[in-house]
Swiss-Prot record:
Protein known as: Holliday junction branch migration complex subunit RuvA
Compartment(s): Cytoplasm
GO BP term (any one): DNA repair
Lineage: Bacteria, Pseudomonadati, Pseudomonadota, Gammaproteobacteria, Methylococcales
The keyword DNA-binding is annotated on this UniProt entry: yes
Domain of life: Bacteria
Function: The RuvA-RuvB-RuvC complex processes Holliday junction (HJ) DNA during genetic recombination and DNA repair, while the RuvA-RuvB complex plays an important role in the rescue of blocked DNA replication forks via replication fork reversal (RFR). RuvA specifically binds to HJ cruciform DNA, conferring on it an open structure. The RuvB hexamer acts as an ATP-dependent pump, pulling dsDNA into and through the RuvAB complex. HJ branch migration allows RuvC to scan DNA until it finds its consensus sequence, where it cleaves and resolves the cruciform DNA.
Gene Ontology cellular component annotations, sorted alphabetically: cytoplasm; Holliday junction helicase complex; Holliday junction resolvase complex
Native organism: Methylococcus capsulatus (strain ATCC 33009 / NCIMB 11132 / Bath)
Amino acid sequence: MIGFIRGLLVAKRAPSLLIDVQGLGYELDAPMSTFYNLPEIGAEVRLYTHLQIREDAHSLFGFGTEAERGLFRSLIRVSGIGAKLALAILSGISVDDFRACVERQDSARLVRLPGIGKKTAERLIIELRDRLDIGVPSLAPASFAGGAAPLPAADPADEAVSALIALGFKPQEANTLVARQAAEGRSAEDLIRAALQSAVR
């Protein structure tokens, strides 16, 4: 089992990132809650990880805190919740807010998350009410300057739309959400954060 990964951040295009660990490139998917705290390209990053092994693929997921990873692991144990949907949930709500929703049985807020309908929200509350395995809160990943060369930057709006689609939004919905937030000089991370916040209001 891979508990964490530390190396140079080579590329990041939500929800995927590439980390160079002593010359070996690891591809990971991460929730936006982790992306918001990533350093610049070329800096060192340390992430907690979860390795998912299936017959057709081995997938690695990265998280800025143990709490995020703990919630991810709890989510994918719920019937009908896969890794992609679990990342979308983590991208749209904080660990503490999710815990509060489950404790208060607040399905109304959960259904505003991408890919979550009424039945799924109710299932999350029922199955996680007594067994949330979130783990111990942790500081953001340690990072400092490294030596990797930056890659050409993608258009922030296009990158934001692609990230939202990868998180479960329909293309038209993703385009609309980003268009509402678009402003000159905003980064892809800023656009994604604003779009997700407007989607769950």
